Amino acid sequence: MQPIRTMRPAETGFAAAARRLLRVKLPPAALLAAAAATVAIAVAAAGWRSTTALTPSAAQLDEWQAMVAQAAEPHALARLRDLARAGSGAAQAALGIALVAAREPGLRDEGRGWLETAAQAQGADNAPAARRAQLALGKALLLGSGDMPKDYARARALLGAAAEHGDAAAAYYLGLIYRSGYGTAADPVQAAHWFEIASQAEIPAADFMLANAYRDGSGVPRDEARALALYRRAAEHELPEAVQTLAMAYRNGELGLRPDADAFHAQWIETAHALKHPVVGP
């Protein structure tokens, strides 16, 4: 029986392929062609490994975004800029979100520019980044950010695009636009529709706004039981407005509740607690 020959470490990979080519009896032209093919495969594989190694994860992008937003950390800023300039929609959105509320006007302008770029990105791969950018830019234009002037029409367009593709936070802000008539005619039905979508994602502020709609019959049929359930769910997330509304309902006997002094005082204490630990907005 012939002994099994094991390949030495030096004969693995590209080096092994080259040695095998040298041992094969081929005409010179065929040998050169085979060698060129081997080199091309090796270069392609190395390039793939390099690209893969340089592609950051979503968690890494989030970390760099936080570092830039909090302290304009130079390394994180440089990495996001490199990736954004190379066409990464995710990096463009992360950099834009990090810089749009920066202290320096130049950085704020840069942030808005990256958000505009990311918001217009096309293709399935860029869709999540486009939604993030549309939400961030739409929110900034609706509420105001730094020296960026409010632009309700542009905000409605951006938030509408994001909401239509399933972004619950964008749906909430779109509901605010239609409820109060920011840059458009107030539309209680549209407001309730978008608050409902955001509420399904259990956004406490959306629960509260939808509860108000059911309580008042604004855009939806009046339904105090539904309103009470939504207020309670928002209060469970310590939304101060919801906790305070429940307290007043117990005091005055509203929303189908009987007056209850003990429940009122308990809710009032919860209101004070909730105000010390406000819920972060969507």
Stretch-by-stretch model annotation:
Residues 39-97:
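N-terminal leader/linker segments that initiate helical-solenoid repeat arrays
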Residues 72, 86-89, 101-103, 121-124, ...:
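Short helix-capping/linker turns of helical repeat alpha-solenoids
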